[in-house]
Curated annotation (Swiss-Prot):
SMART domains: LRR_SD22, LRR_TYP, LRRNT. This is Leucine-rich repeat transmembrane neuronal protein 3. Residues 377-408 are annotated as: Disordered. The gene is LRRTM3. It holds the Pfam family LRR_8.
Length: 581
């Protein structure tokens, strides 16, 4: 009995000693499971944006998810992920990986998602993905792939989505996807593919979405896709497709959306192009080179509920009438920006409005509506009643003569009314723009506006001041006095060399004074014997002429005085010159 008690006590002591050791071992293994600089959430390890050049070796063996995104990994070595046999998803995108060993993914058979996008991979060996047969999602987009091996995806029977977007692929091998029987999404967009073989999609019986946009296809034959019996969405936008044909009589009942926008489609090869897709619901034909669509093509669009036709070069003639009538009866979604590209007079006008306003569909094929000029309205003379005895047979109608109906007048009034509204709106907007400019300049530069106002006020004040000065000053008056001396004064002047001369005052701003000269100069001088003195000066009166001797010793003194209304004039004595001669 005592021995048993001692043995129990010793066993409990051993357990107490072993328990801390086990705990320390578990803690150390947990610490070893999360590498330095990484973030661990349960069994998920995130080593992102760490500039890693090698994959950490201290990752726990029970890791279910590993993210090594945004690092500097350059290659994947042999058995790179050995020991991580529980791994279900692996993210290696946005690295510098250019070389992958054929056996790099050995030991991770449970992997379901592998992301290798945005690297520098230029090729894969055929057996690269053989160890990961349980893959559901494989992303190889945004790399530098030039070609694919014929057995590149062999064995990937559970693959659901395959992304090969934005590479440099030119061709796709025949039957390369034959083992991908469960594939639902295939993205081959943004490559350089020019053509596809007829059996390239063999075995893809569950594919629902196919991306072939931004490639270099020039022709499209719907007979390439008879094996895609489950395809619902086909994207072929922004290629160089000019012709769409159908060389096989079959019904593609699964297709619901077809995107052909951004191509160079001018016409369809025949009315049976869309007859093989009776359940088509969405059709994109915008940004092509279509000028019209025939009635047979329109009749095959029996299930459409969404269509886009903008960005084409629609010719607004009678050929457009079938499309306009179809659009009017279409009850689904459509764009309203279907614009005429020709003729020149209708460029920029909505197709439906052009047909409605210009009666394009109401005219014969030989008659053209002249839109460059407005035709004058015809005037009709009232018919005078004929006498009953003058009954003449009716003249046959002239060929081509038509009487304008009431629709023409209504259309003209409608057009003129629109022009009036457009002109009024333009005038109103221009006035608003002017007012806005004035307001902004007043707010932005208040000092300059004040200076302009002050300058305008100064100009007004100066103008008013000039007008007041003109009213205050008297009008300029000039008098010409014809001075004729008497006989006694003439004889005295001849003998003595002197003679009296009278200066009269008058209201003017200028004055004239007589010139001093001798007798011979006086008799021979034919110009007025006057000169001009300073302005506003009053002259001395009764100043005589002097001889040459007296001129040397004598100076003419004039007493001046400022006066605004002074002018003195001297007469001319040309009559005496004539008498003496």
């Amino acid at each position: 009995m005592g021995f048993n008690v001692i043995r129990l006590l010793s066993g409990s002591a051993v357990a107490l000693v072993i328990a801390p050791t086990v705990l320390l071992t578990m803690l150390s293994s947990a610490e070893r499971g999360c590498p330095k600089g990484c973030r661990c959430e349960g069994k998920m390890v995130y080593c992102e944006s760490q500039k890693l050049q090698e994959i950490p070796s201290s990752i726990s063996a029970g890791c279910l998810g590993l993210s090594l995104r945004y690092n500097s990994l350059q290659k994947l070595k042999y058995n790179q992920f050995k020991g991580l046999n529980q791994l279900t998803w692996l993210y290696l995108d946005h690295n510098h990986i250019s070389n992958i060993d054929e056996n790099a993914f050995n030991g991770i058979r449970r992997l379901k998602e592998l992301i290798l996008s945005s690297n520098r991979i230029s090729y894969f060996l055929n057996n690269t993905f053989r160890p990961v047969t349980n893959l559901r999602n494989l992303d190889l987009s945004y790399n530098q792939l030039h070609s694919l091996g014929s057995e590149q995806f062999r064995g990937l029977r559970k693959l659901l989505s395959l992304h090969l977007r934005s590479n440099s692929l030119r061709t796709i091998p025949v039957r390369i996807f034959q083992d991908c029987r469960n594939l639902e999404l295939l993205d081959l967009g943004y490559n350089r593919i020019r053509s596809l073989a007829r059996n390239v999609f063999a075995g893809m019986i569950r594919l629902k979405e196919l991306h072939l946009e931004h490639n270099q296809f020039s022709k499209l034959n719907l007979a390439l896709f008879p094996r895609l019996v489950s395809l619902q969405n086909l994207y072929l936008q922004w290629n160089k497709i000019s012709v769409i044909g159908q060389t096989m009589s079959w019904t593609w009942s699964s297709l619901q959306r077809l995107d052909l926008s951004g191509n160079e489609i001018e016409a369809f090869s025949g009315p049976s192009v869309f007859q093989c897709v009776p359940n088509l619901q969405r059709l994109n034909l915008d940004s092509n080179k279509l000028t019209f669509i025939g009635q047979e093509i329109l009749d095959s669009w029996i299930s459409l509920n969404d269509i886009s036709l903008a960005g084409n070069i629609w010719e607004c003639s009678r050929n457009i009438c079938s499309l306009v009538n179809w659009l009017k009866s279409f009850k689904g979604l459509r764009e309203n920006t279907i614009i005429c590209a020709s003729p020149k007079e209708l460029q920029g006008v909505n197709v439906i409005d052009a047909v409605k306003n210009y009666s394009i569909c109401g005219k014969s094929t030989t008659e053209r509506f002249d839109l460059a000029r407005a035709l004058p309205k015809p005037t009709f003379k009232p018919k005078l009643p004929r006498p009953k005895h003058e009954s003449k047979p009716p003249l046959p109608p002239t060929v081509g003569a038509t009487e304008p109906g009431p629709e023409t007048d209504a259309d003209a009034e409608h057009i003129s009314f629109h022009k009036i509204i457009a002109g009024s709106v333009a005038l109103f907007l221009s006035v608003l723009v002017i007012l806005l400019v004035i307001y902004v300049s007043w707010k932005r530069y208040p000092a300059s506006m004040k200076q302009l106002q002050q300058r305008s006020l100064m100009r007004r004040h100066r103008k008013k001041k000039r007008q007041s000065l003109k009213q205050m000053t008297p009008s300029t008056q000039e008098f010409y006095v014809d001075y004729k001396p008497t006989n006694t004064e003439t004889s005295e002047m001849l003998l003595n060399g002197t003679g009296p001369c009278t200066y009269n005052k008058s209201g003017s701003r200028e004055c004239e004074i007589p010139l001093s000269m001798n007798v011979s100069t006086f008799l021979a001088y034919d110009q007025p014997t006057i000169s001009y003195c300073g302005v506003h000066h009053e002259l001395l009166s009764h100043k005589s002429f002097e001889t040459n001797a007296q001129e040397d010793t004598m100076e003419t003194h004039l007493e001046t005085e400022l006066d605004l209304s002074t002018i003195t004039t001297a007469g001319r004595i040309s009559d005496h010159k004539q008498q003496l001669a």
